[in-house]
Amino acid sequence: VVEDDLGELIYLADPPGTSGHVVSLRVLARPAPGGDVLDCEFVVETETVKGSFPVYLTSDDLDDWEEALGALAGNRFVSWLNSGRTVQFKIKPVSPGGIAVSVHDGPSSQVTVSVPLFPATGWIDDQRARLEKVRRLFSG
């Protein structure tokens, strides 16, 4: 996987050699000088579906994602980006090592894509590291 310079806030994938399901949140552009919005897109890839959903994130959204990661570490369901202004993202622990991930484009297409995933051990710590990298984009 080749990442661009700005990377991905979220990257959840099945192990190599399995279904190949991937859900990611790519950072497309840095905030404008003095700006407080990050231009991103959710990308969902399965054997039969590939879709992308534009999303704009604020620093408050990043704080909410940090809280969501804490809930996931406690094996709890999370729903992130619930304001209705953008795509909604949900993760539900469903089995040991397994999660159900859904992306719902309420404001625009009304499409929901749900994907079962078995991310690698340590995936929550990986998401936390990605969050810290993305937060640095806001600070310069």
Regions found by a protein language model. Give the residues of each.
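Intrinsic, low-complexity N-terminal interaction/targeting segments
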Residues: 33-40, 86-109
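Short loop/beta submotifs within extracellular cysteine-rich repeat domains
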Residues: 49, 71-76, 108-110, 136
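Mixed-charge, glycine-accented linear interaction segment located at domain edges/termini
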Residues: 106-140
